[in-house]
Amino acid sequence: MKLNDIREGNYVKEFEFSSRGRALEPFYRVKYDDLGYWHFMVGIPITLEWCKTLKMNTEIVIPTSTTRTNYDWIAEAPGIRIIEYNKAITVYHGMGGVKTILEHIKYVHQLQNFYYGYWGFEIDEENPTEFYKEPKNE
């Protein structure tokens, strides 16, 4: 299966260092607001509901007169952070060899030994636009 990655031209490599001065893996920052639509792959929109479906940790800012944040909502999972601010999506991830969110999810599942089970859905590799489906009970 060929996955379409549409990040070209919207992607810079950044490096971050820990407080101990130890270099971390390359950290990639991707801005999608100038594409007109925000996808990791064709057919998969990045929205707050999508992040909740993936069981990512999410936080929504409730606007008040004293709210001073630089995001409207934020979603995090191991190795990835997604931020929306003023209707622009910014994605940060530290998986250097991973080119699409499908590969990232597989990587995280394998790392945590949760592949096709813990999160309660399976990745439909035949049709990646149908990103998740309920597992079949046999």
What are these regions, as identified by a protein language model?
Residues M1-E138:
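Structural boundary micro-motifs
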